Amino acid sequence: MHSPGSTGPGDGRAADIMDICESILERKRHDSERSTCSVLEQTDIEAVEALVCMSSWGQRSQMRPLTPVSDSGDVTTAVLMDTAAPDLPKDFHSFSTLCITPPQSPELTEPSTGTPVPSQVVNSKGCMVTALPPSPAGGPRTLSKREPLEPASGSSCRAVMTSVIRHTGESPAPTRFPTGPTQEQRASDSGEGQERLLDHLEALQDTRLANGLLVTNLVSCQPCLHKSGGSFPTDKGQQTGWPAAVQTCLPKNPESDLSRKITPLISVPVSSPPVLCQMIPVAGQNGLFSAFLKPPTQLPAGTIKPILPQAASMSQPVFMGPPVPQGTVMLVLPQNTFPQPAACPSSVMAIGNTKLLPLAPAPVFLASSQNCAPQVDFSRRRNYVCNFPGCRKTYFKSSHLKAHLRTHTGEKPFTCSWDGCDKKFARSDELSRHRRTHTGEKKFVCPVCDRRFMRSDHLTKHARRHMTTKKIPGWQAEVGKLNRITLAESPGSILEPLPASG
């Protein structure tokens, strides 16, 4: 691990920082001894090196950029450095601190009595993120992200540094980084090394676009700590074993990478939607409905399941509770719970844009422009129109239209076959009705007074007379008819008069 700086005016400040680092290492060593782990962790070394790098921010001739790459979208920048072996680690750390992320740093700083120290945050992939406090020169608070390192593969001292920042921004733009000066540059106060590195940066960007060599070296993100062969030496006097290349830390697929981050964190059991039974009373039913519920499929306690697909959008729930094991649920509702809908026929009744289906528990709202009306509506449309001049009557059936046309033409094809009767009729039902006048058949019987009629319309008119005088509902008339039939069929009725005694 290199020293904070042997020359320069910041020796006193560097000594203070080293005291803080030694206190941190002492505390970490004490914690590791308590946990029966005597090996110094790699994250501690990286934290100390990040603190050492802080000593050079106040001596820079240029201000540190605020998120140089994060505002321009997903940009991958490679920096090629050709420097001497002793100077390479210092440039490496100065460049690594520029690989920063958007300024939303986590509020996980560790309190201390003296100078604030950086806090170490390890994400789900094992990459260490070090939050640095603001520098005295007014530098912004940023995050420094370390990339995974590999052991040196040869005597070459060329190092490729890659900054990967995924951030929502604008179109990518070329980025220039102010580089950290080495010890020799601080002593001579010259910017030749910075200009040389910027030239290498532009040349490398052109080369990368031409041959795409860096594309073949992309690997998926791995933990920053290697299992063996640590890249940072623990001795202050040794500077050997520095990496020759830095692997690019890019996810292969953003969607799959996000799923891998989220999946192992927490697994929340998803409960089923609630049971929502909504029953609307209909006139004549006394507000009593039976709701048939399917047996639930092993739901945990407290979860509820919906029955109707359209019940979730209704605004007036009636019953809400846990699912029943099995069987039938009877819901008894007061008559004033819901507004009484109009009585509908057995097929379909339309009220404006509301379609009341025969067995539906709630009305289904359909737009008048939609072509999804039930099939029964098409069968009840008046498609047959009379084309006689001045008559535009419509009918449901073609036979009815033909019978109507005979009234215009005067045609009467149905003739009575009774002896001495030559009457003709335009419709067959009229002929059948006329035949009953010859036979005397009266097939329509009143259920109240047992009067018989030849025609059904005559019976309807007679029954209406009963309803207006006695105010007897139709179902009571049917019950009275059944009672009379039962009394007539029972032998030895008590209502029969007793024979007179002689």
Swiss-Prot record:
Which organism's genome codes for this protein? Mus musculus
Is the keyword Transcription regulation in the record? yes
Family, per entry: Belongs to the Sp1 C2H2-type zinc-finger protein family.
Subunit field text: Interacts with SIN3A.
Name of the protein in its database record? Krueppel-like factor 11
The answer to keyword Repressor applying to this record is yes
Choose any GO biological process term that the UniProt entry carries and state it: negative regulation of transcription by RNA polymerase II
A GO cellular component annotation here is:
focal adhesion
According to its UniProt entry, the function of this protein is described as:
Transcription factor. Activates the epsilon- and gamma-globin gene promoters and, to a much lower degree, the beta-globin gene and represses promoters containing SP1-like binding sites inhibiting cell growth. Represses transcription of SMAD7 which enhances TGF-beta signaling. Induces apoptosis.
Zinc fingers, C2H2-type class: 384-408, 414-438, 444-466
**Primary residence:** nucleus
Q: Which UniProt keywords apply?
A: Activator, Apoptosis, DNA-binding, Metal-binding, Nucleus, Repeat, Repressor, Transcription, Transcription regulation, Zinc, Zinc-finger
Specify where the region named Disordered lies, as residue ranges: 133-156, 169-194
User: Molecular function (GO) terms listed?
Assistant: DNA binding; DNA-binding transcription factor activity; DNA-binding transcription factor activity, RNA polymerase II-specific; transcription cis-regulatory region binding; zinc ion binding
- What gene name is listed for this protein? Klf11
Pfam families in the record, alphabetically?
A: zf-C2H2
Q: What does the UniProt induction comment state?
A: By TGF-beta. Expressed in a circadian manner in the kidney and epididymal fat tissue.
Observed effect of gene inactivation: Mice breed normally and are fertile. Hematopoiesis at all stages of development is normal and there is no effect on globin gene expression or longevity.
Localization per Swiss-Prot or TrEMBL: Nucleus
**What InterPro entries does this protein's entry cite?**
Znf_C2H2_sf, Znf_C2H2_type
